[in-house]
Each structure stands twice: as structure tokens, then as C-alpha cells.
């Protein structure tokens, strides 16, 4: 019967480098001198890469620390460009949704923390008016009163335009009940007449029918030619002021209607494209991004 042959295994690994796992002479192995210097500088032992019990080559420990200190963050490796594009697209669509819902973007704390990307530098401008589109009809009104004779301004009208007193010839002047016209060269109302005008406006709002000053045929016949001319110019000036005021109101109404139409179109397009973007979810508060970080 053959004798059993046993293989002797040396469990003494004092001559094996803990980094490269190669056997060498025991005299050439030592502990990590870099961790030893860091411990002397105040770094706790729990943050060190090697303990005092590990033995290895000096070059192996230096290469180990060199590889460990390389600038290779995990976030840069695990984050894909597609995820970054989805994040930017989600934030941009959320901004469009907030703009369409007429929300205040400047008060949003989340938007103030975002990066200075060109997509996020846009802000809602309340004073901006939308330009007419290519298929929009041309307005049938003018912003200025068109004079039929296209002649020079008369002396009386020029004196009226050069007055420094505040002008109150608006819609309220046509509603004033006891308005009278003076025959002097200055036809603008003074401060006391302005207060009467405001009082007449408040009274006219409560009355069922608004009234404006009128003259009978006898009163007009008793006036001189100069008085009639001044009265005519004053009435023309009132008509021009009312016309420009109504024109401004119509323009503001058209601008608001155009802006509302653009918002409705934006919301409709976003709802149609919602199914094509799996990174977005529809909720009661609007579109919410669902991008994994």
C-alpha cells in the first residue's frame, strides 16, 4: 500500500506583498509610509487606506495611493448624456407650462437655484406685447387722429397744446353735467374744475344714463364767431382724446387676446407631446419631471 503523499502549505505570509501579492524577501517589506505620514498630520485611522499591520513594497503603496487619488468621480461615470438632456428638456417644458399658466417665474425658488444655462435665462416679461403674426389681420384703426384738412394747427389750438396746466378732457368731460365753456383764450379747466369733474364722474356712474353738456340753438345763436370757433376746436380736441383713448383700449384688448391664443396653443402642443416624453408625468399641479438623479 502506497503511503499517502501530503503537500505542505506555508501559511506564513510575512514575505508576501499585500498589494501585488508577490512573494519577496521579508526585509524589503514595510508598512505604508504614506498612511503613516497622514496619520501624523492628523488624519484619523478610519480614513486611511492601509493599516499598520499590512506589509508591502514601498513602490506598491505609492502606486496604490496614486490610483486612489486620481480625479475620477463616480457621478461622472454613472451619469449618461441622455439623462442630462432629459433633465434640461424637463426643466424647459416645466418653465413653458408655468408661463402658460401665468405663474410668477421670478418668485420660484427652484428656478433661482438652476444653472446658468441659456434655456433657463428666459424670464416672463409682463410689459412685452406680442408682435402680429403673419396670418393675423391688419388692424382697421389708427393710433392717431387723422386730420381731414391736413393743414397747419390754428393759433388757438397751438395755445391749448402749450398750456402747462394738467389736462382733464377725457371721457369724464363728456359726462360732466354742468360744464360751461369760457370765452377766454385759455380753455383748459383749472384745479377746482378738475375736482368738480371727478365729482361729476362719480355721480354719473350711479345715474342710469350718462349726460354730456349740450347747447340749445338760442345759446349758439347768441355766441360770437370767435366763441363758436373756440367751442368747435375744444370739441374736436375732446373727440381726439376720446378716440385715442378708445384706440389704446382696443389695442390692449387685441394684445391680450393674442397672448391668450398663444398660451392655449402652447398648452395644446405640450399635451399632445406628453406621450412622447416618458420622463414627464401628468399631475394636478402640471407637468412634473421624473428624471432619476
Curated annotation (Swiss-Prot):
InterPro entries associated with the record: EURL_prot
Pfam families: EURL
Keyword annotations: Coiled coil, Differentiation, Neurogenesis
Coiled coil: 226-260
Tissue and organ distribution: Expressed in undifferentiated retina and lens.
GO terms classed as biological process: cerebral cortex neuron differentiation; positive regulation of dendritic spine development
Assigned protein family: Belongs to the EURL family.
UniProt function note: Plays a role in cortical progenitor cell proliferation and differentiation. May promote dendritic spine development of post-migratory cortical projection neurons by modulating the beta-catenin signaling pathway.
Protein name, per record: Protein EURL
Organism annotation: Gallus gallus (Chicken)
Gene name for this UniProt entry: EURL
